[in-house]
């Protein structure tokens, strides 16, 4: 973003318009990423961490692979207009090795379990961001995108 001079435009959009971050778009909102040990936009307090490969175990004890690829349940942290018509525990499609760890858990709009419980969606004012890919998440993902289009924070 800095090399292309896009930081001011992204910061302006995040401050003044409905803003949806998807996957790395969620991660870049935080202060620092372990991926490449780089600073991010620092719009939200917290960091981006890597899944701990060696410790990734499912509830049945089986080893979980990193990156996390596939469908997983998303447990909503409370009511939000972007969750309208989407069941709590609905499955969305993920492809990632890193996840956000907000400094303030009240930013968490959803959590997902994949060896560890991680924040899979965040919300604050006009910002909503997700770790999963709604564009690849069938009806639930399309519903979230439609809700975003109608959203007026």
Regions found by a protein language model. Name each.
Residues 11-14, 47-153:
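Amide-donor transfer/coupling interface in amidating biosynthetic enzymes
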Residues 1-68:
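Cysteine-nucleophile active-site neighborhood
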């Amino acid at each position: 973003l800095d090399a292309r001079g896009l930081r001011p435009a992204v910061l302006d959009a995040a401050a003044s318009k409905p803003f949806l971050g998807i996957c790395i778009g969620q991660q870049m909102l935080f202060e620092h990423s372990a991926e490449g040990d780089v600073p991010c936009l620092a719009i939200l307090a917290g960091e981006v961490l890597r899944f701990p490969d060696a410790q990734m175990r499912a509830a049945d004890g089986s080893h979980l692979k990193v990156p996390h690829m596939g469908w997983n349940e998303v447990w909503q942290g409370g009511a939000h207009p972007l969750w309208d018509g989407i069941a709590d525990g609905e499955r969305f499609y993920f492809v990632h090795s890193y996840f956000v760890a907000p400094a303030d858990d009240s930013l968490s709009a959803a959590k997902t379990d994949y060896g560890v419980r991680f924040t899979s969606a965040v919300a604050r004012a006009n910002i909503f961001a997700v770790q999963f890919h709604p564009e690849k998440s069938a009806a639930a993902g399309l519903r979230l995108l439609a809700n975003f289009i109608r959203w007026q924070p």
